[in-house]
Amino acid sequence: MGSISVTMFSDAACPWAYSVSPSLRVLEWRYGEQLGWRLVLIGLTEQASQYLERGYTPLRGAQSQLRFRRYGMPFAPQPKERVSATARACRAVVAARLLQPGSEWRVFRALHLATFTTPLLLDDDVQIAEALRQLPGVDADAIIARLDDRAVSDAYERDKAEARTAAGSAAELQVKTAQTDGPVRFTAPSLVFEGYGQRLIAGGFQPIEAY
């Protein structure tokens, strides 16, 4: 564990979280083992109907990706077969964390890449498994088999609850929070730095200079 802990609140469906990847690599390169990272899954939606009720469509999703290309990550905007929820993908990341601590980061990045460059549906277990089979040392089938395990469900719910503790935080003052399903939550990719008696919050997407 590094001398400074970094908690990242994120979700595999968020283009802002995907677009911050270059900045995260810079932080890792500059500070290395001084930083101890922890990934907390927000769980943006449990059901696709939540997105549909907000007016999301496959075409709208593809079109919205165009404005994120300027941040340097690859996007292949094409309308997906349908709108999908994010809970199953978040559970896959949590399952990876429990099965093989540390592998959750690779699983998370693989799902991010597949989300924005392929037709992947984040709530389709078969498609999630296909995306993860490309990762050496990751047992995609074992991850999928545990998506509904009690341990995974409990850990996922803890992540969701922690992500929804942003009320009154610096992130809220930065107007980098949301309230889509009850409590005020952190938006992706919020970073919380803790160490040397300080707690600093960079809410939502930020340029590398903010970190």
Predicted feature descriptions by range:
Residues S3, E81, T180-G182:
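Residues embedded in well-ordered secondary-structure elements
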Residues S19-V126:
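Structural alpha/beta surface segment adjacent to cysteine/selenocysteine redox centers
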